Amino acid sequence: MEKKFYNFVKEVYDKQLGVEGIAIADGEKILMEHHFTPDQARNIYSHTKSYMSTAVGLAIADGKLSLDDRLAEFFPEAVPENAQPELFEIRLRHLLMMSSGFHEPYLMGANRRAGVGAPDYVKYMLSRPVKVQPGSEFVYSTADSILAGRMVEKA
């Protein structure tokens, strides 16, 4: 097995396959492992949404949040003076379902890398127009997840 393992490691290097690491385990015991890249922080992109939703669930279980909590009520300091009435209808449940009503994939891709909305994403998002009734339509949105996560932070 050891020879096959190291032959595979060599093949990964030779073919530049982009593998970060490999391990062979038996139950909980790691028998062999090899790391092709140094230990460093990685951007895990949308995996973060799973952790955020788990944190929301824990906060709900602890009584710190409710699915019916309203976004604008959590961040009154970020609500613009001329806010649309629909902004006050966005609830935590809408953020988790990516149906906030902003109806744009804000804070994704090139915009996020360029720092659009930074450093205050909450204030930035609460100044965006609500284009459809909250809860009515799904649009994949990093912004909705960021806002839900900020509600957890503040709870």
Where are these regions (language model features)?
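Aromatic- and histidine-enriched alpha-helix N-cap/loop-to-helix transition segments
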Residues: 45-51, 87-90, 139-146
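Solvent-exposed loop and edge beta-strand segments that line ligand/cofactor-binding
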Residues: 40-44, 83-86, 133-140
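Active-site SXXK
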Residues: 28, 43-68, 95, 148-153
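Catalytic-site signature segments of enzymes, centered on catalytic residues
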Residues: 108-155
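Short linear capping/connector segments at secondary-structure termini
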Residues: 35, 40, 70-79, 109-111
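A short, well-structured edge-of-sheet supersecondary motif
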Residues: 4-38, 67
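Active-site helix/loop module of the DD-peptidase/beta-lactamase fold
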Residues: 62-102, 127, 155
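Extracellular/periplasmic catalytic domains that process cell-envelope and extracellular macromolecules
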Residues: 15-16, 86-89, 116, 131
